Structure formats: C-alpha cells, structure tokens
Amino acid sequence: MGCNFSSQSKLQVPEIRASRSITPASQKSEDPYSHIRLLLLGSAESGKTTVLEQVRLLYKQHFTESEYFHRRAFIYHNIFKSIKALCRAMRMSDIQFADPINMGRAQSIIADEHGHYGLFSKDLAEKIKHIWNDKSMQKLYARRSQFNLNDSASYFLNNIDKINMVDYKPSERDLIMAYVPTCGVQNVIFTACNQSFQLFDIGGQKIDRRKWALQYEGIDAIFFCIAISEYDQVMSEDMVTNRLDDALNLLQSISEDPAFATTPIYLFLNEIDVFCEKLSVIPLSKYKPDFKGGDQDDAIDFMENLACEALGKRDRSLYRVYRCIAIDTQMMAELLSTVFKDIAKRKK
C-alpha cells in the first residue's frame, strides 16, 4: 500500500441503522448472541477508540449530550497536554524562542500542574497562542517525530479560538481527532450488510487488560490495533517497555489463547502516515536491527511481517491485515465496509 494515502473518489456509504447509545458491556441485551459480537483490542493509544468513534459516525450512531460534554473536556486537556509537551521539548532542544517573552510563558506552562478539562482563562489562552505561533516553535514542531506528541496537536492548537468559546460543541472531525482514553468497557450496536453487530471496546492500559477475559465468551471476530509509529517509544506505565514490543506480545497472547483458536482477527496497522514521517529522522533499524534498510514500503512490509509472526501458526484464513490511518474517515469508511462484508460472509 505504501505511503500515499489520499483517496480522491467520493465514498458512497450505505444508509445504516444504529442503536442510540454506548453502554457498559454488563448492560447487554436480553439475548447477547442476537448480534455478531466484535472485540476491539490493542494497547493504550493504539487508535482502537478512534476506530470505535469512526464506526459511530459512519454507521449513524449519534452522540448524546453527555458524551459531547465528556469529549469536549478532553479536547481542552489534549490542547494543554500538547502545548506542555512542546514547551518541554523546546527546553531540551537547541532551538530558542524567536520572541524571548515566550520563554517565561513556556516556563509557566511547564509549571502548571492542573489538568485543564474546561475553558481556558483569557490569560492562559493567550499564552498558548503566543507560544504556538512563535516561529521557532513551528521549527520545533517540524521535528515532532523526535518526541512523543499527540497526532492532533496542530489541529486543535490551530483552532483554539473556536474551541475556547462558551458555546463550543465539538464537530464530528473534532470527535475523531480527540484522544479520549477508554474507561472500562463500552459497546455500540449497529447494522451493516443487513447484519446486526455489537462492537466492544476495552481499555488498553495494563491495568485494564485483566477485564478482557470477561468479554471473551461468544466473540465472533477480533479487531486488533497496533500503532506502528510507536517503534521508538516506551510505555507510560513503566517508562521502560517498548510500545511496539508490548503490542506484538499482546497480539501473540490473543492469537494463542484457546478461546480464540478459530476466531478471525482483523489486524489494523495504524498511523502509517506518522510512521513514514518518522523513518527519515529515527531509523527503524536502531530499534529493530533485523530491518536491513530500504524505502518506506519496505519498512511497512517489515512491520507487517512482525505482526504476522506474532500471530504464530494461526491459519491464514483466520486473519486479515490492513494498513490504515484511523483518523482518516474516508479511508476507514472503505476499510470498515470491506471488513464488515467479510465478517458477514463468514457468518452465512
């Protein structure tokens, strides 16, 4: 597939019916097996919740007012977390602010320990805007592949004036771009290919994984997300374990679990765009010595081979591998349509 991801053709997404809300998995319908049950798994920040959000938007699953409120809170948090990460990166870099006043502004941002889940004060909003618009900060941002930064940082920072309004309501695009960690177990029921599906999303942090086994019964297919761009990053839980290694080990454990011996796995290799951007700055071979070099396509092929190796001796008919950008709605519409057709075909 390579790194050319733009799609020019206009998608014709069929009219789809969906249930009203996301509910904890414990609140299942009276007949839990009346739907094709899908389990969405992956490490934290792998993009799996973005996949769930795409399903909700593409398959007409509307958000409630409380869900908008919840996501709006995390958008403010995303903005502050991003500007704080950029300020810290600036402090560690060889770049100086073009406007010296921004150095003091950045120091105050770094020292601010509040989570900021609501409207910014006028003073804080101005600080963020001045820092973000500094010419030197834009030079630093061009190096973003060298440090851990939310993919949506520029999107939200460029829209801070719109977002920092009392009557702000997130757009569909805002909902997709926001990083909102999964709390507990959520599920959505929708209809595709004349079949009723129920998709479960479970938190991907290590502390949440003990809950996974509670959802294993009666699962018809697994969606597993891996953010391949994280080959150089470590997990926030211990600051030691490589994120990609953790994801591959997790995939291997799922593939080897007797409960899923005959369950098809749909593997989403996510963040292909970020991965390609990183390669020229952070060599893949530094973290994966078995990679002998080549172009971006060779690197992506290598990552796919790693994932297939993690699947072990699983029959080829029991897994599919897709390369994707989870925040790209058009790409995900095409991908999900293909996946749901394949699952529906298996169930006939």
Curated annotation (Swiss-Prot):
Residues 174-182 are annotated as: G2 motif. One of its GO terms (cellular component) is cytoplasm. GO terms for molecular function: G protein-coupled receptor binding; G-protein alpha-subunit binding; G-protein beta/gamma-subunit complex binding; GTP binding; GTPase activity; metal ion binding. A lipid is attached at G2 (N-myristoyl glycine). It holds the Pfam family G-alpha. Residues 266-273 are annotated as: G4 motif. InterPro entries: Gprotein_alpha_su (IPR001019), GproteinA_insert (IPR011025), P-loop_NTPase (IPR027417). SUPFAM superfamilies: P-loop containing nucleoside triphosphate hydrolases, Transducin (alpha subunit), insertion domain. Disulfide bonds: none annotated. Residues 34-348 form the G-alpha domain. Mg(2+) binds at T182. The keyword tRNA-binding does not apply. Residues 324-329 are annotated as: G5 motif. Residues 197-206 are annotated as: G3 motif. GTP binds at residues 42-49, 176-182, 201-205, 270-273, 326. The keyword Metal-binding applies. It comes from the Eukaryota. Residues 37-50 are annotated as: G1 motif. A lipid is attached at C3 (S-palmitoyl cysteine). PROSITE patterns: G_ALPHA. Keywords: GTP-binding, Lipoprotein, Magnesium, Metal-binding, Myristate, Nucleotide-binding, Palmitate, Transducer. G proteins are composed of 3 units; alpha, beta and gamma. The alpha chain contains the guanine nucleotide binding site. Belongs to the G-alpha family. Guanine nucleotide-binding proteins (G proteins) are involved as modulators or transducers in various transmembrane signaling systems. This is Guanine nucleotide-binding protein alpha-13 subunit. It comes from Caenorhabditis elegans.
